[in-house]
């Protein structure tokens, strides 16, 4: 058979499995990334960001990805007792932890035949998390320690006036706002995103940060919900909004509720997203904060091989 010149081009191949958790997509990278060494997930993240960031861009940016997509690089764990290691990333950079992404990863590991129902340890750049795959294929994630860093922080937002919120850590840094005057609904996401972007810019101008000067890159707006305990809109880094209720954001919310004495340990909190998907959450008390557990479900959506041709001018993504 005659092979065309096109077929003989040098190509790089990246094997992926896509899923979504409550509408929020996760792209698990199974193979095709460069070796990152045998260090911790935090050390491997640093190598990936410093030396091989174009692979993140190729997977997540257009023409192969989108702003809403979260990547999860599947890694061999450091500890023999862990099921997997993972490095999370999106169109804006890297994430220390991702709740919906961990749920998607665990569902994907089951699809790959690597785990069955039960409790599994997952290594992340910010510490180990415990994930339970239930018989119905839903997943509970016992997250890293969550805590409130600052209460009732006020920033001036042009066009909106003074906005008050809490700064909290749930695996990523959040500014959580309940009194915002916005309608948290799926048909209002453009206005919500514009408002949350303005709040994030105001935080940056005011020098409001998380612990040790860490940037606050997630904005979470809460509203009452007739069926669940709360409905939320989460603006992620890179200006995409979270279709799921956001696992790390829900963890940050639990930390604030616990600090205010509004939710007792072990009591279930039902958090709805802006599109109506739901996580169930509770926490255990811990020194310096709370240890949240988030439960949700992921569904598989694709299994494919991404191809990067050497002569493709957009092979490594279109910068946003």
Swiss-Prot record:
UniProt entry keywords in alphabetical sequence: Isomerase
InterPro entries attached to this UniProt entry: Pro_racemase_fam
GO molecular function: 4-hydroxyproline epimerase activity
SUPFAM superfamilies tied to this protein: Diaminopimelate epimerase-like
EC number, as in UniProt: 5.1.1.8
Binding site for substrate: 99-100, 218, 242, 247-248
Reactions performed catalytically: trans-4-hydroxy-L-proline = cis-4-hydroxy-D-proline
Pfam families: Pro_racemase
Catalytic residue list: 98, 246
EC main group: isomerase
Family statement: Belongs to the proline racemase family.
Function: Catalyzes the epimerization of trans-4-hydroxy-L-proline (t4LHyp) to cis-4-hydroxy-D-proline (c4DHyp). Is likely involved in a degradation pathway that converts t4LHyp to alpha-ketoglutarate.
Matching PANTHER family: TRANS-3-HYDROXY-L-PROLINE DEHYDRATASE
Name under which the protein is recorded: 4-hydroxyproline 2-epimerase
């Amino acid at each position: 058979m005659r092979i065309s010149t096109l077929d003989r081009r040098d190509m790089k191949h990246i094997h992926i499995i896509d899923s979504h958790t409550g509408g929020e997509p996760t792209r698990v990278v199974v193979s095709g990334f460069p070796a990152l060494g045998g260090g911790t997930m935090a050390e491997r993240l640093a190598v990936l960001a410093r030396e091989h960031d174009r692979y993140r861009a190729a997977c997540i940016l257009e023409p192969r990805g989108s702003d809403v997509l979260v990547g999860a690089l599947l890694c061999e764990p450091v500890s023999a007792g862990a099921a997997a290691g993972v490095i999370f990333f999106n169109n804006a950079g890297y994430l220390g932890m991702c709740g919906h992404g961990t749920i998607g990863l665990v569902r994907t590991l089951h699809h790959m035949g690597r785990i069955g129902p039960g409790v599994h340890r997952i290594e992340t750049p910010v510490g180990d998390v415990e994930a339970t795959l239930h018989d119905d294929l839903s997943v509970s994630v016992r997250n890293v320690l969550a805590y409130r860093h600052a209460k009732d922080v006020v920033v001036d937002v042009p066009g909106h006036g003074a906005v008050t919120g809490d700064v909290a850590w749930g695996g990523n840094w959040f500014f959580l706002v309940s009194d915002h005057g916005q309608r948290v609904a799926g048909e209002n996401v453009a206005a919500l995103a514009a408002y949350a972007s303005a709040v994030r810019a105001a935080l940056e101008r005011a020098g409001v940060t998380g612990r040790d000067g860490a940037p606050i890159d997630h904005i979470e707006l809460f509203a009452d919900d007739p069926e669940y305990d709360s409905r939320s809109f989460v603006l992620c880094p890179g200006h995409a909004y979270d279709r799921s209720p956001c696992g790390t954001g829900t963890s940050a919310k639990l930390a604030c509720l616990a600090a205010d004495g509004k939710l007792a340990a072990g009591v279930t909190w039902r958090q709805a997203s802006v599109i109506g998907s739901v996580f169930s959450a509770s926490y255990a008390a811990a020194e310096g904060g709370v240890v949240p557990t988030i439960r949700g479900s992921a569904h598989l959506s694709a299994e494919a091989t991404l191809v990067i041709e050497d002569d493709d001018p957009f092979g490594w993504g279109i910068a946003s």
